[in-house]
Amino acid sequence: MKDKQAKNNYLSLTGEVVFNKLLIPDEYLGNKRYTLTINLDKDGIKLAEKNGLKTDDYKGKTQITSKRKVEYGMPKVYNADKEEVDATHLSLFGDKVTMLVKQGKQKENSAYTYLERVRVEEKAEGVEEYDYSEF
């Protein structure tokens, strides 16, 4: 397998969306962040382990959550044709994605990742673009 690590500690992690908090950011201790949690696929697990990233095991699946502070702007979202699309293109769960993430710079944060971009490789079956206006 070709090493997917790029310059400046950027990594491409692949898997299936579990929690999508791009349009309605998470708020924790007064800090708002865009977050995306995915179940990593086999290649994603290998890359995360190789780079010492913080993952969680849930019901036999290896998950990773990447974050981005709201003040940095929403991460860009792309479709499978690599065209930039609206964030509503990303389903709340089930889509197969590639996340471009950056490892934390501080030694104590090196296991965490910061979300840069997301590409939807395959839409979840039976799931359409989400209409957030209902909230």
Task: Please identify what each model-predicted range represents.
Residues Q63-T88:
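Beta-strand/loop nucleic-acid-binding surfaces
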